């Protein structure tokens, strides 16, 4: 009797996993919840007829174990190395909104993350 319940529960769990696999899309889920790098209107500084845009979105990033030969050359050895690109402005135009000088982004791309540099 015990084995019948165990087999029934196992089959039920297996069928649920198959169903979940078919329900979810088979696309790349690494950027789940994060849109691609593109221009978006800044609601704080934009005025009717004078929109201000900024670059927003996600780009590439990854982390991996630091190779031993690289670790030996570090002043402060770290076990994890990370690489990243950020959504930055490719082209900008300076604008004046309410006597405040702003930089209006006109084009975006994924490039070096400036705040990661030391």
Curated annotation (Swiss-Prot):
Gene3D superfamilies (alphabetical): Cystine-knot cytokines
SUPFAM superfamilies for the chain: Cystine-knot cytokines
Cellular location(s): Secreted
PROSITE patterns referenced in this protein's UniProt entry, alphabetically: GLYCO_HORMONE_ALPHA_1, GLYCO_HORMONE_ALPHA_2, GLYCO_HORMONE_ALPHA_3
Disulfide bond annotation, renumbered to this chain: 34-58, 37-87, 55-108, 59-110, 86-113
Role: Shared alpha chain of heterodimeric glycoprotein hormones. These hormones bind specific receptors on target cells that in turn activate downstream signaling pathways. Involved in gametogenesis and steroidogenesis.
Protein name: Glycoprotein hormones alpha chain
Origin species: Ctenopharyngodon idella (Grass carp)
Annotated gene: cga
């Amino acid at each position: 009797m015990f084995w019948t319940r165990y087999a029934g529960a196992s089959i039920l769990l297996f069928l649920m996993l198959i169903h979940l696999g078919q329900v979810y899309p088979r696309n790349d889920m690494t950027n789940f919840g994060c849109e691609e790098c593109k221009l978006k209107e800044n609601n704080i500084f934009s005025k009717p007829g004078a929109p201000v845009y900024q670059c927003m979105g996600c780009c590439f990033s990854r982390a991996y174990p630091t190779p031993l030969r690289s670790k030996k050359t570090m002043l402060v050895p770290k076990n994890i190395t990370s690489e990243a690109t950020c959504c930055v402005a490719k082209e900008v135009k300076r604008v004046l909104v309410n006597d405040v000088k702003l930089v209006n982004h006109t084009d975006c791309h994924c490039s070096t993350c400036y705040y990661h540099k030391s």
